[in-house]
């Protein structure tokens, strides 16, 4: 039985998958298995996997595309290791990741998972030091070291932790049923919040022991709606005992519903969009943006899209968009 199970879910990224798998094969700690779970890729992923003649590599190919979370779960359910990590097919581990994270879990029985800091890399596997430093500061990773004192705050308020740079005890993931399919698109956020609510203990290594790839380009409207629906599901499913934290949850939920309502109106789902905008405005109050979106929802789609595109030109770019521009 391997000590560590490394799960790499993949879909149509054969070119990046090679880099990801080789980063595991080159680890200084070698007691692992690699589980590549393929969500019915239509590229040459099966042929790429065949090049590795190593009994530690297991390949699970889904018969049909079932979505990210379901594909990830298939790898988790197949895992045999005491410890478990999942990272995406376009990311990578630095050579000492397993050695240093395994040492913490071996030496500290009360710790359920170990997170590390990570690099930002571009399409050519080049590290961007400025983007890495900014990312670390934005998400509060640069102030963490050792046992994480308030895991729920780090997971829910600051969103400091990332699944792809974390080694877990597999049994702690089993205790919370790992990833929920309904959270597809914001699995990291949801998993860490549920681990915190279950009383699990996290540990943070400030070294940069993983590489996270940022891609250029914009996210599509369909992708944005998918993410916002998943985030709304997650926020609706939590209930915090602490009064102030519960207030934050309700405020965040209202904000997500407003953002989702705006995008549904843009997508032509007018009735559902208006309903969410009205619901969120009860908590946030009506704004000029919401009022305008409600008016636009009664206009033909061609007019609606024209005005939306014009307004978008004046919207300041968010953090993710700025980073994508830098690393692309």
What are these regions (language model features)?
Residues 200, 207-216, 220-247, 266-284:
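Catalytic core of nucleotide-sugar-dependent glycosyltransferases
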Residues 84:
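Short aromatic/hydrophobic "clamp" motif used to bind/position activated sugar donors
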Residues 62-79, 89:
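Glycine-rich, basic loop-to-helix element that forms the pyrophosphate-binding segment
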Residues 139-226:
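Conserved nucleotide-sugar donor-binding catalytic segment
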Residues 1-25:
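N-proximal low-complexity "stem/linker" segments adjacent to membrane-targeting elements
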Residues 70-72, 99-104, 110-172:
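Flexible acidic/His/Gly-enriched loops in nucleotide-sugar-dependent glycosyltransferase catalytic domains
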Residues 2-5, 33, 190:
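Cell-envelope/extracellular polymer assembly enzymes that use nucleotide-activated donors
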Residues 30, 38-47, 64, 88:
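A conserved acidic beta->alpha catalytic loop
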